[in-house]
Amino acid sequence: MTIIEFDTALPEYAAPCERPVIQMLIDFCLRDDGKVSVWDGEELSVHGCSSKAHILKNLAQTEMDQVEAYDKDGNCRGWFSLIYHNGSENEPMIVISDYSYNEWTENVYRRLDGVFGGIEL
């Protein structure tokens, strides 16, 4: 059994079952000096940030976000589209509605799915 520790309060407006998935996603994005930008559908609410707390505080302010991951040199690794309260009450991975398809994003998604896929909370 894997025990996952996470902040039960962030992102504040995400469903509680979505929070561990989102937090682990951000952890993967920030590995190896990565940076994250967040497009909330209206503006970049986060731009090139490496602070997990700042990123999480700015997620779920709208009904969806696009999380863009960058490596330490500023090259885009890929993006993940998050839609909040989208039927994830029983399946937390549903918060990730889409992602750019490449080796890096597929690896991140598979690792998240290995932890959270098929789990009903």
Residue positions per predicted region:
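Negatively charged, low-complexity tracts enriched in Asp/Glu with abundant Ser/Thr
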Residues: T2-A60
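Mixed-charge, Lys/Arg-enriched low-complexity segments
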Residues: M1-Y13, N90-L121
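Arginine residue identity/basic-tract feature
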Residues: R19, R31, R77, R110-R111, ...
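Acidic, low-complexity, intrinsically disordered interaction modules
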Residues: V36-R110
